[in-house]
């Protein structure tokens, strides 16, 4: 069952990384990296439904990826993996709202994470749809304007709007300006 979920796995041990990717592959598209720096770059490049991160990485703590992940991907499910039950680490994980799991973990654990990520994504999509419908009515938005808002809500980079809608970039710019004028909201910029 492929649900189209996107997972970011940040784990420095290649064998564990492969195991996690294998366990997540039946639920979506896992991307795996081995360092904090690579994790930050991956988070900047796209949005994810779930982050599975090791605590001890060669260039820092995986815990330092939680805040940037939540900022870039609101509603992201975070699972922190650790080889030892250090009280201070577990405390930090729980304070961040993430889950933790002691290594080793198996495919059954990955299914639980995938199910939670899918549930959160579906809830987020329902809220977005309700908001878009309300805005369409309140601001008398055209179908094109609703589509622009929808692309923004999906996390599509503004530069890619013209490609997705198959129009010129200056057309997108004008449509966004009209949308901003109608709504009086500059958060779309």
PLM region spans:
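Regulatory hinge/linker segments at domain boundaries
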Residues: 119-151
């Amino acid at each position: 069952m492929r649900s189209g979920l996107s997972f970011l796995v940040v784990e420095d041990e290649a064998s564990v990384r492969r195991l996690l990717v294998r366990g997540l592959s039946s639920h979506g598209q896992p991307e795996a990296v081995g360092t904090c720096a690579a994790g930050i770059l991956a988070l900047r490049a796209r949005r994810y439904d779930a982050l599975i991160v090791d605590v001890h990485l060669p260039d820092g703590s995986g815990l330092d990826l939680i805040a940037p992940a939540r900022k870039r991907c609101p509603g992201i499910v975070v699972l922190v993996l650790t080889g030892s039950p250090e009280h201070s680490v577990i405390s930090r994980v729980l304070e961040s709202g993430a889950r933790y799991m002691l290594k080793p973990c198996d495919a059954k654990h990955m299914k639980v994470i995938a199910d939670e990520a899918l549930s959160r994504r579906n809830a987020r999509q329902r809220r977005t749809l309700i908001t878009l419908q309300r805005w369409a009515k309140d601001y008398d938005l055209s179908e094109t304007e609703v589509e622009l808002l929808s692309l923004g809500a999906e996390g599509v980079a503004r530069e890619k709007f013209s490609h997705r809608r198959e129009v010129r970039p200056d057309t997108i710019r004008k449509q966004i300006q009209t949308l901003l004028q109608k709504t009086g909201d500059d958060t779309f910029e």
